[in-house]
């Protein structure tokens, strides 16, 4: 399997991004035990732009943990593209967009999985980020907002048309 220039084994093991879990120490431990790719905790685009210290610390990457993806979430294309440019300075292999978090404080504000209720905005954000950075951009999302709105088949094609290099699907709504 290959994402952009990154070659992975036939059956790669990816460490999912998890808030308050996938810090540098945990990522290094997972690499030691076989993870082929690791992700940072998800990072708020707005907090990154405001230079919130705790958020900036999430950009720390050690060479031993590579390849690494920095995952961002937000609800506005301008903020997400600016945050992606800032994240790119940390030199990750990939910029990943979180369109799958169902937590109320994220989705309830129209970010994460909340963007599954506004596909045009999700596509606008994705296009803006792809254009803003040189690094490959990937997306994590869900099958749809709820059981009556499973949109992943059409959405996957639309995201590909925006220029993403890979898509991770959390196989539920």
Enumerate the predicted regions with their spans.
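Short, hinge-like loop/turn segments at secondary-structure boundaries
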Residues: 55-59, 113-115, 155-157
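Glycine-rich, positively charged N-terminal anion/phosphate-binding segment
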Residues: 2-4, 18-93
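Alpha-helix initiation/capping motif
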Residues: 19, 115-118
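Nucleotide-sugar donor-binding and catalytic loop/hinge architecture
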Residues: 6-8
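Alpha/beta enzyme core
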Residues: 32, 78-111, 119-173
């Amino acid at each position: 399997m290959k994402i952009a220039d990154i070659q992975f084994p036939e059956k790669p093991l990816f460490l999912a991004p998890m808030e308050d879990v996938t810090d540098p120490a945990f990522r290094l431990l997972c690499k030691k035990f076989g993870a082929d790719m690791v992700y940072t905790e998800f990072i708020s685009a707005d907090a990154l732009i405001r230079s919130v210290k705790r958020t900036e610390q999430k950009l720390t990457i050690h060479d031993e943990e590579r390849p690494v993806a920095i995952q961002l979430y937000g609800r506005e294309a301008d903020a997400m593209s600016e945050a992606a440019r800032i994240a790119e300075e940390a030199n990750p292999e990939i910029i990943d967009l979180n369109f799958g978090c169902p937590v109320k404080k994220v989705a309830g504000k129209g970010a994460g999985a909340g963007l599954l209720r506004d596909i045009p905005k999700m596509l606008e954000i994705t296009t803006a980020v792809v254009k803003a950075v040189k690094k490959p951009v990937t997306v994590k999302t869900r099958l749809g907002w709820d059981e009556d709105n499973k949109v992943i088949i059409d959405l996957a094609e639309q995201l590909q048309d925006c220029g993403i290099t890979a898509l991770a699907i959390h196989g539920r709504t």
